[in-house]
């Protein structure tokens, strides 16, 4: 792999900071966007300074200043955006980035902020969670209308949110005595170590096999059921949990009285664990789809048994 100039937008976020690290480790000239408001957050600012110590370049720009964005993207070959999808307004900020990339005319690859379920497959998703997918599709359309070279990354379930707590609603720590199994617990799900997500993302930036395609992260040993995840934890911890199966109807009933953010989470879990939206389709090269672990077999990805060890 050669040396690229990579700009990460959202580099202080949950997945963004890992992508910055992976880019540096892979020897790329790494640039991190520094937005004015970042200087008001001591933790984010210190994180940016730590990137600088590791060799990254900090580039000042603002979504409210088009010319600053154009100057930033003119510095690089690749732009990776990882702004949070938790706030829908943040996703549409990417439209400003698309305009800057279009004007600059030099970017060879743009990876927008997705990294979860494939929004192209979620047109019938439940409200209010559907809004996230709809907005991601708005960004995709803008990218494609502008003929910007791109890769969409479907990274499925981050371990920190879905594995450590055995996908339970509430705390991010493992349950100590009881666990709710969604449905019969036998729907296949894809769980990912976040650092592996970053590694696969960086490996794709110069790969023509992923150009203008959707890359799914579906390493075979991480395609397991909810019940298998729970059983893995039980074997590691030596603690047998009391299991209660929850029907789809009862699960959806949990939405009642919840705030919007909680409803979004419940809706997304429903699609993952009851409908099997991460695995109920084949990856089809004819539809410009590729799978990461097949493209990069040299990556020693983290299995969920190993991911769970830190929780013991």
UniProtKB/Swiss-Prot annotation:
Class of this enzyme: oxidoreductase
Protein name as annotated: Bifunctional pinoresinol-lariciresinol reductase 1
GO molecular function annotation: lariciresinol reductase activity; pinoresinol reductase activity
Subunit description: Dimer.
Keyword DNA-binding: no
Primary role: Reductase involved in lignan biosynthesis. Catalyzes the enantioselective conversion of (-)-pinoresinol into (-)-lariciresinol and of (-)-lariciresinol into (+)-secoisolariciresinol. Abstracts the 4R-hydride from the NADPH cofactor during catalysis.
Alphabetical list of SUPFAM superfamilies matching this protein: NAD(P)-binding Rossmann-fold domains
Species the sequence originates in: Linum usitatissimum (Flax)
Domain of life: Eukaryota
InterPro entries: NAD(P)-bd_dom_sf, NmrA-like, NmrA-type/Isoflavone_red_sf, PCBER-like
């Amino acid at each position: 792999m050669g040396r690229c100039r990579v700009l990460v937008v959202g580099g202080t976020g949950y997945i963004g900071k890992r992508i910055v690290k992976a880019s540096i480790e892979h020897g790329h000239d790494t640039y991190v966007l520094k937005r004015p408001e970042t200087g008001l957050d001591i933790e984010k600012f210190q994180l940016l300074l730590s990137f600088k110590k590791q060799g990254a370049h900090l580039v000042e720009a603002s979504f409210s200043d088009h010319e600053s964005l154009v100057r930033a993207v003119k510095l690089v070959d690749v732009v990776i955006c990882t702004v949070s999808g938790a706030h829908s307004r943040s996703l549409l900020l990417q439209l400003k980035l698309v305009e800057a990339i279009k004007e600059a005319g030099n970017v060879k690859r743009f990876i927008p902020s997705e990294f979860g379920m494939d929004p192209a497959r979620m047109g019938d998703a439940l409200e209010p969670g559907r809004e996230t997918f709809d907005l991601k599709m708005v960004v995709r359309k803008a990218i494609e209308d502008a003929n910007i070279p791109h890769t969409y990354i479907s990274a499925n379930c981050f371990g920190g949110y879905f594995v450590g707590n055995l996908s339970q609603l509430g705390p991010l720590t493992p349950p100590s005595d009881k666990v709710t199994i969604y449905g019969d617990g036998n729907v296949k799900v894809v769980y990912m170590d976040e650092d592996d997500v970053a590694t696969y993302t960086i490996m794709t930036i110069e790969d023509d096999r992923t150009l203008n395609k959707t890359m799914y992260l579906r390493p075979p040993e991480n395609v397991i059921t909810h019940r298998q995840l729970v059983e893995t934890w039980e074997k590691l911890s030596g603690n047998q949990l009391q299991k209660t199966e929850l029907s789809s109807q009862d699960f959806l009933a949990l939405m009642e009285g919840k705030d919007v953010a909680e409803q979004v989470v419940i809706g997304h879990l429903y699609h993952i664990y009851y409908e099997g939206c991460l695995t109920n389709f084949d990856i089809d090269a004819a539809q410009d789809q590729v799978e990461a672990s097949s493209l990069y077999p040299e990556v020693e990805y983290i299995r969920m048994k190993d991911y769970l060890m830190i929780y013991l």
